[in-house]
């Protein structure tokens, strides 16, 4: 009886492990049914994607993870895109100019021996 129960438990665990991976390769498709007309505060926007198709839209992703569709021709949307792009390039250039700990140590060592 215990062997049967142990075998059944093993089969259940194996089935759960196999089924867990099914469907993970399917991409999440964002579909806009309506476009937001009210302005979204730019400081709440984390990133965006541009959706082409039957309904062209810009999909903003907020810092809380919400997806909001907006009209790509709206003036506030164009301004928000420029701001988010500027924020991304500013943080990228800032990351490139900050020296690492090893670089700081090397420059200190050169200063001390010079």
Curated annotation (Swiss-Prot):
It is found in: Secreted. Disulfide bonds join 32-69. GO terms for cellular component: extracellular space. Residues 87-114 are annotated as: Disordered. One of its GO terms (biological process) is positive regulation of granzyme B production. One of its GO terms (molecular function) is protein homodimerization activity. Residues 1-21 form the signal peptide. SUPFAM superfamilies: Interleukin 8-like chemokines. Residues 98-114 have a biased composition (Polar residues). Keywords: Chemotaxis, Cytokine, Disulfide bond, Secreted, Signal. Chemotactic activity for lymphocytes but not for monocytes or neutrophils. In thymus, mediates medullary accumulation of thymic dendritic cells and contributes to regulatoy T cell development, playing a role in self-tolerance establishment. PANTHER family: CYTOKINE SCM-1 BETA-RELATED (PTHR12015:SF101), SMALL INDUCIBLE CYTOKINE A (PTHR12015). Belongs to the intercrine gamma family. This is Lymphotactin. It comes from Rattus norvegicus (Rat). The lineage of its organism: Eukaryota, Metazoa, Chordata, Craniata, Vertebrata.
